[in-house]
Amino acid sequence: MAAARVFRSTALRQFPVIQIRRNATLGTSAHGDVINVQQIPAPGAGHIRVLLLNRPQARNAISRQLLNSLGKHIDDIKAEQGKGPTRALVLASNVDASFCAGADLKERATFTKQDTEAFLAQLRQTFANLDELQIPTISAISSMALGGGLELALCTKLRVFGSTSIVGLPETRLAIIPGAGGTYRLPRLIGKNRALDMILTGRRVSGAEAYFLGLCNRLVEVTPEEQGKPGEAREKVLRESIKLAQDICEGGPIALGQALKAVDGFERGAEAENEAYLGVVETEDRFEALKAFAEKRKPSFKGR
């Protein structure tokens, strides 16, 4: 196996230092405390919304309450249509042991058949809405992401893993299959053969192998000493994820949205790229970039 490129956590240059309180809420969510929220200033204007899953007693398993809360946050961002104050989204955990353990099987055991069908429909729609957001989205994972937890991470555009991460789709070992997008989002990301290996065996994949497979975009080194300190790995991966979001948000908001559209439509080739290019070439941001280049200064983008 080729050696993974490891990103060592660095200071957030040119931006406010972000203090992350370990094992503590980062503000109160309007949608309930199963998700804690922080808004980080983005370069120029707007903010990066950080959502921290917070069900420590259930390893962030997806309950009705958690799904409702997550869905409302995603709906809020979707309503902005890429033109609001939310420049990027980082999805992370407020729990050391797990990013997300998938479905809440204890709660699921109480469901009727109709309850299960309704829950799955809501889960799939929420994940689809996340997948379709018109802003950069990042999952920050430093621990376990299994089953629906990995399927959730597959819905974001980018993923930052710690070297301590363990991910997988173990459903076939439970006599079912991934049911929230894993069977098509995973092969779309890493290819059919590699996806079949993970899905058919149900095996767990380390952070290093996930990077090798193309499952994550960044791999953050967590030392044994850091791993032994509560919150250290989680904080380190979250910082790298926020830094990535800040770096991305240095770009023009319209250009970022059009780039996402173009890459999402890559199978159409030049047609998708040309359509997206027409959406940026005559914008105020584009003219500001040209002017700033001539004047040897940093551009000030307005999202227009």
What is each residue range found by the language model?
Residues 101-103, 186, 194-203:
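Short helix- or helix-capping micro-motifs
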Residues 85-86, 92-128, 145, 175:
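Glycine- (often His-adjacent) and acidic-residue-rich active-site loop
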Residues 203-209:
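Acidic, divalent-metal-coordinating active-site segment for phosphoryl/phosphodiester hydrolysis
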Residues 2-92, 128:
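Conserved CoA-thioester-binding segment of acyl-CoA-metabolizing enzymes
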Residues 126-174, 204:
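Glycine-rich beta-to-alpha active-site loop
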